[in-house]
Amino acid sequence: GSEMCIRDSFTSLPSYLPTGSLMIFNNTKVIQARLHFRKETGALIEVFCLEPIEPNDYVLNFQQTEHAAWLCMIGNLKKWKEGTLKREMTVKEQPITLTATRGECHGTSHWVDFRWDNPEITFADILEVFGELPIPPYLNRDTQESDKETYQTVYSKIKGSVAAPTAGLHFTPRVLNALKEKGVDLEELTLHVGAGTFKPVKSAEIEGHEMHTEYISVSRGTIENLIAHNGKAIAVGTTSVRTLESLYHIGVTLLKNPNATEEELHVHQWQPYETAEETASITSVKALQAILDYLNRHDMEALHTSTQIIIAPGYDYKIVNTMVTNFHQPQSTLLLLVSAFVKGNWRNIYDFALNHDFRFLSYGDSSLLIP
């Protein structure tokens, strides 16, 4: 496309999108993932729940009573050498005692075992009452009551993220209705945003960066709708982009191995680049059809797997042809993803944003990218 940059208000978004196009949103919901404990010594320890370990299914874990284990980041770790953290609280008008025991270390995170003494209270109840919403650290402030509303998208449904898919924060019911009136089809999928999203690329070469893995789920209906739209879509947010592009590569795996297990469908970091030659001739519709066939064979309503895809310059986009995204910080994998999409144009776009006082990051302004 042309190198044009235009500044407009977000409410006029529908006027830039063609009737009959398909727009896809990530319906994940941010969980109140930060738990605070005070030791007898007075030290404050923060336990930040990143992903469920036991059980490792999000829904089942939230439904757990009396016991649940998570992979957690621990704040003030040096003060928690050993022993069990304890906190007493009232949940649903019942007094309970929650304990946390630290398990093995995984990189910068630890397994943490939570136990509580009331079989009627679920882990979801505990996070709801006792957890704090993890707003971005650079805001340099405590979480406020208003964040519970402003840091969730209006269409958030499926609990599991530790950060909001922030491109979606701009969408109000009014904008969503205007999109429908314009004849834009709206669909959803789920990617639970992990803390790894914020991990800066520290290596000079991208080969040195290990991408984080995130859980994804896409319903049969969304895949059928993608096929109906010729395998092309407008993605809202980098998380939707990564999920949609991962779908293509999952389809390619299934074309080669129709009996692949859920584990084998996981998209590895460099997989798209290693298979670039063979994928040159595989259309997105063909790849998506392979997923649909897989769901039909197994009588499944949705695809559940995980992705570690890293989208960087040199990546060949297969499904996403337009994206809505905020402005990202330097040294982020998000900026790599954008620059792979608009090719060398990202500098012009970011210069324009800086010169026109656009705001960056989570609570910042938005961009509609049409390469």
Summary of predicted features, one role per range:
Residues 2-3, 7-371:
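Surface-exposed, charge/polar-rich loops and edge strands
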